[in-house]
């Protein structure tokens, strides 16, 4: 189930926070509740991705993106992600989430998010998102202009650029093995 009450709490908590630069870092604090756990009594890996919404969407609100999406009838979608899990977050532990836009290219905006306990990073996700309209993907330079920001991205870190290039090599739609195809409806 989506954490609607926690999402509402975050949006209310940061509704009057100072405006955030497009590449500024949004910092928020959270608790791992029992309903976030997997059978090993730690934060579930899928739930981790859901909880990252609690940082990413308030970050978008603080940067001024959400009102622009509404006014222009644009949407935002996740076009890819890469996650690293390194340390456990257990029941009732507090953690700090950092969310920032790392940069953009001609199609996508790249967001870097981390969850930390103290100074130790527990996990990190790289999110590639697209702003969409009825006509398709809105170029990020156009989105930045709407935000009053420079249309040119800061240089993408090498690891993000390499991930994007590697992902472009991935076949789509996926090439299914013959035994997998046998289970698809005709």
Q: What name fits each language-model region?
A:
Residues 47-70:
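Active-site helix/loop of acyl-thioester processing domains in fatty-acid/polyketide metabolism
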Residues 23-34:
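Short amphipathic
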Residues 27, 78-80, 96, 110:
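Short coil/loop residues immediately preceding or within conserved phosphate-binding loops
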Residues 14, 79-85:
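Short structured motifs
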Residues 39-51, 181-185:
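A conserved, well-ordered hydrophobic junction motif at loop->secondary-structure transitions
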Residues 68-75, 91-93:
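Short N-terminal edge-element motif at the start of the domain
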Residues 1-16, 89-186:
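HotDog/MaoC-like acyl-thioester-processing domains
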């Amino acid at each position: 189930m989506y954490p609607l009450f926690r999402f509402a709490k975050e949006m209310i908590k940061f509704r009057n926070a100072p405006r955030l630069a497009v590449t500024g870092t949004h910092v928020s604090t959270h608790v791992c509740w029992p309903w976030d756990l997997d059978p090993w009594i730690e934060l579930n890996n899928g739930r981790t991705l859901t909880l990252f919404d609690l940082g990413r969407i308030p970050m978008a609100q603080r940067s001024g993106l959400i009102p622009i999406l509404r006014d222009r009838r644009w949407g935002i979608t996740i076009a890819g992600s890469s996650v690293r899990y390194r340390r456990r977050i257990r029941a009732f532990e507090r953690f700090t989430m950092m969310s920032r836009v790392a940069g953009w290219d001609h199609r996508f905006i790249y967001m870097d998010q981390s969850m930390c306990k103290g100074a130790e990073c527990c996990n990190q996700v790289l999110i590639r998102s697209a702003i969409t309209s009825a006509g398709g993907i809105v170029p990020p330079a156009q989105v930045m202009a709407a935000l009053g920001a420079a249309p040119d991205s800061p240089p993408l870190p090498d690891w993000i650029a390499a991930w994007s290039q590697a992902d472009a090599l991935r076949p789509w739609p996926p090439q299914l093995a013959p035994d997998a195809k046998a289970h698809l409806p005709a």
